[in-house]
Amino acid sequence: MYKRQGYILISDVVKPNAKEAISGLKAAGVEKVVMLTGDAKKVADAVGSELGVDEVRSELLPGDKVDEVEKLIAAKGEKEKLAFVGDGINDAPVLSRADIGIAMGALGSDAAIEAADIVLMDDDPAKIATAMKISKKTLRIVHQNIVFALVIKFACLALGAVGFVNMWWAIFADVGVMILAVLNATRALSFKE
């Protein structure tokens, strides 16, 4: 008769800061976090509960993940965006289908990296919230530059039409505003969390 000498357990390990990453996403304005996984329902539900995921969809084949993303895309609002984070070769179709595909690059497959819109090279999921904050700051700066340039140019145009400003003001409205916009844009380089 044989006697057991031990067990071998094979499992995926949850990234150490995954829970903090999900909290960071929610703090950054993400309304709903859905986990799509091929894992068994019991395991997926336990991991989802541990991480604070809003919804778990488990036992999915790669094609099923695409179908689930299609359902999520159909259910979202017109101005809402759907982001998908993945690292495996099986995630490539979903990464390319999502509005924003984010690949975890250091351990990610080449197919996932190629299909993604954003690649995080250090596999730290907390960087997703940081990337969102940087993009929001960058968009604010772009909007500021556009409004500033239009206000100055239209003011010089209107004042020039009635004869209050000369050619030097027009040069300032063109070159000076461009230089100020570039200097304003450099603020995006000094991002601090």
Predicted regions and their residues:
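Membrane-embedded alpha-helical bundles of multi-pass transporters
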Residues: 29-30, 51, 55, 74-75, ...
